[in-house]
Structure formats: structure tokens, C-alpha cells
UniProtKB/Swiss-Prot annotation:
Region annotation Disordered: where it falls in the sequence: 618-651
Induction pattern: Induced by heat shock and cold. Induced by dehydration stress and abscisic acid (ABA). Up-regulated by viral infection.
Cysteine-cysteine disulfides: none
GO cellular component, one term: cytosolic ribosome
Tissue expression from the record: Expressed at a substantial level during normal growth in root, stem, leaf and flower tissues, but not in siliques. Expressed in cotyledons, leaves, stems, vascular bundles, roots, stigmas and anthers.
Name of the protein in question: Heat shock 70 kDa protein 1
Major site of localization recorded for this protein: cytoplasm
InterPro entries the record matches: ATPase_NBD (IPR043129), Heat_shock_70_CS (IPR018181), HSP70_C_sf (IPR029048), HSP70_peptide-bd_sf (IPR029047), Hsp_70_fam (IPR013126)
Organism, as annotated: Arabidopsis thaliana
A Pfam family reported for this protein in Swiss-Prot or TrEMBL: HSP70
Description of the deletion phenotype: No visible phenotype under normal growth conditions. The double mutants hsp70-1 and hsp70-4 exhibit accelerated bolting, flowering, and branching, small round shape and flat leaf blades, thin stems and short siliques. The double mutants hsp70-1 and hsp70-4 exhibit reduced tolerance to abiotic stresses, such as heat, cold, salt and osmotic shock.
Gene3D superfamilies in UniProt: 1.20.1270.10, 3.30.30.30, 3.30.420.40, Actin, Chain A, domain 4, Substrate Binding Domain Of DNAk, Chain A, domain 1
GO biological process per UniProt: defense response to bacterium; defense response to fungus; defense response to other organism; heat acclimation; negative regulation of seed germination; response to heat; response to virus; stomatal closure
Biological function: In cooperation with other chaperones, Hsp70s are key components that facilitate folding of de novo synthesized proteins, assist translocation of precursor proteins into organelles, and are responsible for degradation of damaged protein under stress conditions. Probably involved in defense response. Chaperone involved in protein targeting to chloroplasts. May cooperate with SGT1 and HSP90 in R gene-mediated resistance towards the oomycete Hyaloperonospora parasitica (downy mildew). Plays a role with WPP-domain proteins in facilitating WIT1 nuclear envelope targeting.
Length: 651
């Protein structure tokens, strides 16, 4: 334990399509399965007229309720509504998105009959809460501390927004780390004993929605990210889409019907395609069978692995480009890469493995760690290190992350002057002296940008501030020191100081555009609590309803049992039967009643049935004898307590 009484620190891989959680325990990492027994949980949140669902339950009902089922929140987090990637993604999502204040994309759903709006951070926080609960259920303690991973590509505002999601979920996010770095840690632990000297490792991470390639060097437990590249919009879902389109065309040819306007049909087809894709990684062909796909028409078809590869060949080939770019950026030849590590479920596709292996001239790929779990595995190790729980096995792992994009400021003529080049190891600090470019200039505007282009207009403005009060002087005379300082979480502080007057000003770039304010986070934390208590209420309701239902049906079965039925006076038997009938009728009409209504109904029913049954047992005491009587009790429904174990299964 971390000695803070907060249970161990967990590692969470918050994925675009699936998330995964791990913890360091008994000197190794445990990847924790959810209540469905799955070691990964869909990053889905659904809202219905009666409840909120997260994870498998949400994904399973997406066909019935596409407009109120939110997924892909990671594609929105820390972005602006007007961002071109948000605009193009919106076309593919069934749920509604509109621009909120400050150009922030807001998600609209209907929940319990009213329209609700959520920021991407809130949706992600719900997934994080789910992951935390999965860990808590397994460990039996409350958990506060977590390490959360993000793509190496994420810029500052996306990292910050992910951190905010953690805060809303009631977590203390100890560190945000890059996914490839996490995978490398998982891998480093596996390989550490044997390695001597520096190793270059290429992490090839092809997940459900994104693709990242990173090149790291590992030496004596020190990890350094040398370069990153990738495509934020390439992944398993794209392969599914190709297959979906293929079958939509086939359905058009066979039945002259176009299903593209029907979200439910498309969703059912997509679910089948996803399953088929997974099957094709281990078999040469598979079938798709969907009853009554559209207007009552059944759809049966087969697809071979070769056809699947042909549909996606251009995408598979595209996966190799970032690998080349990554090597170029790191100024490294592919022959100097010691290991190629596969991460992400889509790396199970044989063709992807083959292309990658060919690129590295037949080199064996590392598949020793389950590709779905490697990132959470590494995050859990990092959590153990940060909370001082790990043993000597992990303590000497040091983690050096890098900045994914160059950071700098605008100088005369809109030129980007870089202070911190991309792929610089962080934490880092750089200073440079600037001056004024006109005589008697009273102040300078410091504009901070991230990006690789030569002109600032092509890069991303992170923030700006004014340093004023510069005493009149000819141009080029004042000495203004600008300092860029990035901490271990990749959060940037920029300060400027006029050397002559000591005038100072600074800015923390936690990307205020689209960044949540303290108040908003506070409000969202309260909302999260509210939703949690509503979920609890709903669970209580379901349990009370099930208890009543179990009691009524058990009682009905009991009095229908001949051994018991014949011992009951007819009037009593009728009285019980009527009260049960009435209760079952009431149940059917009041599925959405409150928990206490169900409990009252239960008490009412018990007050009628229990005395009669008890009287019967006392009366039967003579013939039945001691043991007999207790034997009867097993049939007779005990009060709500007896429904206990059954309830859990229903829920």
C-alpha cells in the first residue's frame, strides 16, 4: 500500500474504443477484468430513459439507442469544435454535437426524458470512474491515485483535458504518460534482466481508433523517447468500416436496398464485421449471418481473409509510412532497431504483422505481451514507482518523456522561433534573449506556438501574454529573457523578464482555449457524484423490485407444492393466492416505481403470507417433527433476505 491510506495506485489505459486497468500487486502487474469478465472495457457511455450505462452494457445496447450512446470521446477531448478533425468525425457519429461556449464541442443526449449536455471530459471521466470501480471491486479498497496514458501525439490541451477528466472522476492523476512509453515499460520489465547496453525499440501501436509509432532507447532502466509519428485517424474501426461498406454494397446488389440511412441496421452489421475481423486473424474465412437486417430481409454472406486484406491493403500499407518517418526523425537506420513491439488489438492482423516484419527484413516481432494490455501494464508499473510501492524490480526504471511538437514563439514577420525542438526529453528548461524591434517600444507581446512549420500562422497558438513597462530605448537595446519550462507532465510555463527593470510576466500554458475552469471542474465533479448516486438509486430500485418479484413467485411455488398446499386451509390458501396475484399485477404495472414502494408492497405481502405459513408449520409440528419442519423452511420463501444472492445476478 502507498502508506497514504489510499490503496495502491492504478494504471489506466484510456483508449479511444476500449480502456484497460492494471495494478501492481504481489510483485507483478495484474490486469483487472470487469464484471463481465473482460480485461478491456468499451469506452462507451449510454443514457436511457431510466439509467446511465458505462462499458459493455452501453456498447451492447448501441443498436437500440444509437443517438444517446456516446463513444470516441477521446477524439474530442481538448479540441475545439471548429477543428477540422472534429468536423469530419461528426459526420460519422450518431450522437449530436454542437459548439458550446469558447468553441468547445458539447455532446447532447436525452437522459430520463430531458436533454443533457456533456463535455468530452465528462464522458471520459465516466469511463475513468468505471475503470476505477473495476479496480476497487477487485482490490476491495478505495482508490485515489492513478497514472493515465495518452497518445504521444496529444498536444498540451489534450493532455490537460485528460487530467481534468481524472479530477472529475475523483482521481488524483499522479502522472500523464505517453502510451508508447507505457508499452516500453511493460516491455522493459519483461526484457530487463537480459539486456546489456543501449537498445532501440520501435513501438508499433495500432489500436481501435488511432495509430502511433514511437522509437525509444532503453538503457539500464532509462527510457527515452527519440521520435514519434502516426495517424490519429487510423485503426481497427477503419478496417471495420471497409468491411461494412463492402457488405452494404453487396446488400444493395442482392436486395436492391440501401441500408445506409438506417443506423440500427448499420450498427448490427458493424458489430458482425468487428467479430468477423477478429475471427479472420486466426482463420482463413468466416461467415456473417444477420437475421432481418433491413425491412425483414435476412443477410448471409462469407468473407475470406484475402478479401479482407484486399479491402484494407492501402490502409495496411499506410501503416508503414509513420514507421519510416519515425526512423528518419530519430536519424536511425532500420537495421539498428533491436526490437519491434506490437501494441493494440489491430496488430493481431496477420497482414499487418507480415508487412512490418518485411519492412524490418524478416526480423521477429515481439508479441510476448498481450497487445491490448501492454499500455495499462506499463501505466500500473509507473503508478507503483510513483507511489513507492514497487520492489527493486521497478525502482530503477527511470522515465524520460519527450515533447511531441516543437515549442517556440513568434518573432518579427510571423516567424516561428523554436526554443524547444520536438522530441526533446522532458522535464526541460530553455532560455533565450530577445529584444524590441522598434525604437521606444513600450512592451512586447509574447505569443507561444507549437508546431513544425516555419511560419506561426501554420502552427497552433497555445497562449500569449504582454510584457509591458519597458523603458524607452532604441530598438535592439532592451534585453528580454524568455524562458520555456516544461514539467514532467508536459505542462508548459513561459516567462519573460526585462533584464534592466526586472519587470516580469509569465503564463502557464494549460491551453485555456477549451480548457475547463476550476468552477466548471468543480461543477462537473458534483454532477459526477449526482449521476453516481442516481445509478445507486437505480440499483436499489432494481434490487427491491427483484426481491418482491422473487418473494411473490417463490411463495406461489411454495403453496402450489402438494406437500404444503394440502396442509393449508382453503381460505388461507386463497388469501395467499389472491395477495400474490395482486402483487404480481401491481409489479407489471409499476416497473418504474421507487425502491420504498417496492419495499412497502413487500411488507404488505409478507404480513399476509408469513403468519399463515408460520401457523401451518406450527400446526404441522406434530406430524412433521423437528427436522421436517426445518426442511420445509428451505422451500418456504424467507423474507427479503432470502432474495439476497439472487438479486446480484439479476442486476
Amino acid at each position: 500500500m502507498s502508506g497514504k491510506g489510499e490503496g495502491p495506485a492504478i494504471g489506466i489505459d484510456l483508449g479511444t474504443t476500449y480502456s484497460c486497468v492494471g495494478v501492481w500487486q504481489h510483485d507483478r502487474v495484474e490486469i483487472i477484468a470487469n464484471d463481465q469478465g473482460n480485461r478491456t472495457t468499451p469506452s462507451y457511455v449510454a443514457f436511457t430513459d431510466s439509467e446511465r450505462l458505462i462499458g459493455d452494457a452501453a456498447k451492447n445496447q448501441v443498436a437500440m439507442n444509437p443517438v444517446n450512446t456516446v463513444f470516441d470521446a477521446k477524439r474530442l477531448i481538448g479540441r475545439r469544435f471548429s477543428d477540422s478533425s472534429v468536423q469530419s468525425d461528426m459526420k460519422l457519429w450518431p450522437f449530436k454535437i454542437q459548439a458550446g461556449p469558447a468553441d468547445k464541442p458539447m455532446i447532447y443526449v436525452e437522459y430520463k426524458g430531458e436533454e443533457k449536455e456533456f463535455a468530452a471530459e465528462e464522458i471520459s471521466s465516466m469511463v475513468l470512474i468505471k475503470m476505477r470501480e473495476i479496480a476497487e471491486a477487485y482490490l476491495g479498497v478505495t482508490i485515489k491515485n492513478a497514472v493515465v496514458t495518452v497518445p504521444a501525439y496529444f498536444n498540451d490541451s489534450q493532455r490537460q483535458a485528460t487530467k481534468d477528466a481524472g479530477v472529475i472522476a475523483g482521481l488524483n492523476v499522479m502522472r500523464i504518460i505517453n502510451e508508447p512509453t507505457a508499452a516500453a515499460i511493460a516491455y522493459g520489465l519483461d526484457k530487463k534482466a537480459t539486456s546489456v547496453g543501449e537498445k532501440n525499440v520501435l513501438i508499433f501501436d495500432l489500436g481501435g481508433g488511432t495509430f502511433d509509432v514511437s522509437l525509444l532507447t532503453i538503457e539500464e532502466g532509462i527510457f527515452e523517447v527519440k521520435a514519434t509519428a502516426g495517424d490519429t485517424h487510423l485503426g481497427g474501426e477503419d478496417f471495420d468500416n471497409r468491411m461494412v461498406n463492402h457488405f452494404v454494397q453487396e446488400f444493395k446488389r442482392k436486395s436492391k436496398k440501401d441500408i445506409t440511412g438506417n443506423p440500427r441496421a448499420l450498427r448490427r452489421l458493424r458489430t458482425s464485421c468487428e467479430r468477423a475481423k477478429r475471427t479472420l486473424s486466426s482463420t482463413a474465412q468466416t461467415t456473417i449471418e444477420i437475421d432481418s437486417l433491413y425491412e425483414g430481409i435476412d443477410f448471409y454472406s462469407t468473407i475470406t481473409r484475402a478479401r479482407f486484406e484486399e479491402l484494407n491493403m492501402d490502409l495496411f500499407r499506410k501503416c508503414m509510412e509513420p514507421v519510416e518517418k519515425c526512423l528518419r526523425d530519430a536519424k536511425m537506420d532500420k537495421s539498428t532497431v533491436h526490437d519491434v513491439v506490437l501494441v493494440g488489438g489491430s496488430t493481431r492482423i496477420p497482414k499487418v504483422q507480415q508487412l512490418l516484419q518485411d519492412f524490418f527484413n524478416g526480423k521477429e516481432l515481439c508479441k510476448s505481451i498481450n497487445p491490448d494490455e501492454a499500455v495499462a501494464y506499463g501505466a500500473a508499473v509507473q503508478g507503483a514507482i510513483l507511489s513507492g510501492e514497487g520492489n527493486e524490480k521497478v525502482q530503477d526504471l527511470l522515465l524520460l518523456d519527450v515533447t511531441p511538437l516543437s515549442l517556440g514563439l513568434e518573432t518579427a514577420g510571423g516567424v516561428m522561433t523554436t526554443l524547444i525542438p520536438r522530441n526533446t526529453t522532458i522535464p526541460t528548461k530553455k532560455e533565450q534573449v530577445f529584444s524590441t524591434y522598434s525604437d521606444n517600444q513600450p512592451g512586447v507581446l509574447i505569443q507561444v506556438y507549437e508546431g513544425e512549420r516555419a511560419r506561426t500562422k501554420d502552427n497552433n497558438l497555445l497562449g500569449k501574454f504582454e510584457l509591458s513597462g519597458i523603458p524607452p530605448a532604441p530598438r535592439g537595446v532592451p534585453q528580454i529573457t524568455v524562458c520555456f519550462d516544461i514539467d514532467a507532465n508536459g505542462i508548459l510555463n513561459v516567462s519573460a523578464e526585462d533584464k534592466t527593470t526586472g519587470q516580469k510576466n509569465k503564463i502557464t500554458i494549460t491551453n485555456d482555449k477549451g480548457r475547463l475552469s476550476k468552477d466548471e471542474i468543480e461543477k462537473m465533479v458534483q454532477e459526477a457524484e449526482k449521476y453516481k448516486s442516481e445509478d445507486e438509486e437505480h440499483k436499489k430500485k432494481v434490487e427491491a423490485k427483484n426481491a418482491l418479484e422473487n418473494y411473490a413467485y417463490n411463495m406461489r411455488n411454495t403453496i402450489q407444492d402438494e406437500k404444503i398446499g394440502e396442509k393449508l386451509p382453503a381460505a388461507d390458501k386463497k388469501k395467499i393466492e389472491d395477495s400474490i396475484e395482486q402483487a404480481i399485477q401491481w409489479l407489471e404495472g409499476n416497473q418504474l416505481a421507487e425502491a420504498d414502494e417496492f419495499e412497502d408492497k413487500m411488507k404488505e405481502l409478507e404480513s399476509i403470507c408469513n403468519p399463515i405459513i408460520a401457523k401451518m408449520y406450527q400446526g404441522a409440528g406434530g406430524e412433521a417433527g423437528g427436522p421436517g419442519a426445518s426442511g420445509m423452511d428451505d422451500d418456504a420463501p424467507p423474507a427479503s433476505g432470502g432474495a439476497g444472492p439472487k438479486i446480484e445476478e439479476v442486476d
